[in-house]
């Protein structure tokens, strides 16, 4: 089994004083050796973190002691290397940004469907299957016959619904996303818009891949994830995609062989949209990345304080050596 445990979690719960959780949560993550990002808002908690099994267990145990944060929904997957550089706890207005006031999954939400029952539901010809994720996620994998809203961000999803879905015409709507959190809001939104029978995949794609055998699966392709793995396969192991550091789009090995791909600077998805000023900035950033690698440091998204400490330690050792030599 891989050494690094990746834990995606969320819970919609009213956290009246969520700001006060930021500092102690950051401290618990750092002392446990957990990296990744967690978002806190009045509506709850969301994020993905990684560490050893004991580190993740410690974090989940601590969260369970906090009012309202017991029974957090989480999914585990594994990686051979740490997929995050930093430890961050951020304060937000929403833990998943739809931008529609009054949508509260704690009050109204669609019907949860277990992974084992999902195939039967989406095989029903009367069910409209909608992928709630962004276009760059859908392009590398989705469920058979699912509709692609072609949204750039989740904020665009309500407009897609208004323009393309009709409660009178679409009697049964099933939706899915990576870990389940976006569907909490998307199904709540549809219910508010008058849709009656609204379903969503409990635990999201990740839970489906974990519980449904490959030979029985209706999933096609890989699943995009928001960490350095870029995507995972049906075994929840790192997939075949890399990521363009300029536009963050997933890219294949064949796409990296094209003239449009320059490491850290451009790929076929963004080369025509990058200004000369941006290109020069990306070139300089990539140069710094390569220099950092030569020094044994991380650069993009790295823990800056750790890098500074490493450099200071090197300087201190050099000064001491020079002092000892002159003494």
From Swiss-Prot:
Q: Which GO terms describe its biological process?
A: tRNA modification
| Active site positions | 177
The record, for SUPFAM superfamilies, names: Rhodanese/Cell cycle control phosphatase
Judging by the UniProt lineage, the source's domain of life is Bacteria
Start and end of every Rhodanese domain?
Answer: 123-217
Per the record, what are the reactions this protein catalyses?
A: uridine(34) in tRNA + AH2 + O2 = 5-hydroxyuridine(34) in tRNA + A + H2O
* General function of this protein: Catalyzes oxygen-dependent 5-hydroxyuridine (ho5U) modification at position 34 in tRNAs.
Q: What is this protein called?
A: tRNA uridine(34) hydroxylase
């Amino acid at each position: 089994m891989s050494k690094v445990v990746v834990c995606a979690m969320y819970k919609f719960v009213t956290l009246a004083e969520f700001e006060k959780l930021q500092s102690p949560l950051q401290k618990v993550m750092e002392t446990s050796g957990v990296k990744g990002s967690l978002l806190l808002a009045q509506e709850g908690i969301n994020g993905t973190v990684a560490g050893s099994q004991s580190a993740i267990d410690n974090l989940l145990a601590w969260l369970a002691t906090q009012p309202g944060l017991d029974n957090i929904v989480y999914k585990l997957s594994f990686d051979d290397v740490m997929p995050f550089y930093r430890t961050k706890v951020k304060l937000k207005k929403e833990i998943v940004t739809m931008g529609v006031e009054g949508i509260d999954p704690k009050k109204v939400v669609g019907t949860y469907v277990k992974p084992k029952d999902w195939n039967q539901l989406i095989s029903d010809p009367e069910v409209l299957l909608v992928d709630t994720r962004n276009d760059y996620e859908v392009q590398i994998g989705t469920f058979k016959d699912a509709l692609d809203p072609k949204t750039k961000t989740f904020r665009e999803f309500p407009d897609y619904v208004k323009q393309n879905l009709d409660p009178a015409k679409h009697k049964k709507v099933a939706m899915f996303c990576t870990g389940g959190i976006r569907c909490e809001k998307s199904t709540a939104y549809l219910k508010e818009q008058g849709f009656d029978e609204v379903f969503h995949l409990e635990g999201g794609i990740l839970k489906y891949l974990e519980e449904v055998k490959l030979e029985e699966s209706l999933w096609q392709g890989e699943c995009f994830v928001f960490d350095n793995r870029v995507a995972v396969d049906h075994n929840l192991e790192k997939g075949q995609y890399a990521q363009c550091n300029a536009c963050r789009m997933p890219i294949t090995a064949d796409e990296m062989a094209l003239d449009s791909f320059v490491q850290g600077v451009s790929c076929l998805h963004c080369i025509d949209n990058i200004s000369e000023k941006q290109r020069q900035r990306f070139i300089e950033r990539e140069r710094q990345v390569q220099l950092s690698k030569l020094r044994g440091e991380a650069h993009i998204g790295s823990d800056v304080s750790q890098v500074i400490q490493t450099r200071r330690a090197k300087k201190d050792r050099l000064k001491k050596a020079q002092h000892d030599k002159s003494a």
